[in-house]
Amino acid sequence: RIRKPIFAFPRF
């Protein structure tokens, strides 16, 4: 999901 860019980019 696109909730946090730090967890959504590296962890998608």
From Swiss-Prot:
GO terms for cellular component: extracellular region; host cell postsynaptic membrane. The keyword Secreted applies. The keyword Secreted applies. It is found in: Secreted. Its main location: secreted. The modification Phenylalanine amide is found at F12. Expressed by the venom duct. Keywords: Acetylcholine receptor inhibiting toxin, Amidation, Ion channel impairing toxin, Neurotoxin, Postsynaptic neurotoxin, Proton-gated sodium channel impairing toxin, Secreted, Toxin. Both amidated and non-amidated conorfamides As2 are found in the venom. Amidation is important since amidated peptide is more active. Conorfamide As2a: this amidated form is active on both ASIC channels and nicotinic acetylcholine receptors (nAChRs). Potentiates ASIC1a (EC(50)=10.9 uM). Inhibits desensitization of ASIC1a and to a lesser degree ASIC3 currents, resulting in a sustained opening of channels in the presence of low pH. Inhibits with a slow reversibility human alpha-7/CHRNA7 nAChRs (IC(50)=689-3867 nM) and with a rapid reversibility human alpha-1-beta-1-delta-epsilon (CHRNA1-CHRNB1-CHRND-CHRNE) nAChRs (IC(50)=208 nM). This is Conorfamide-As2.
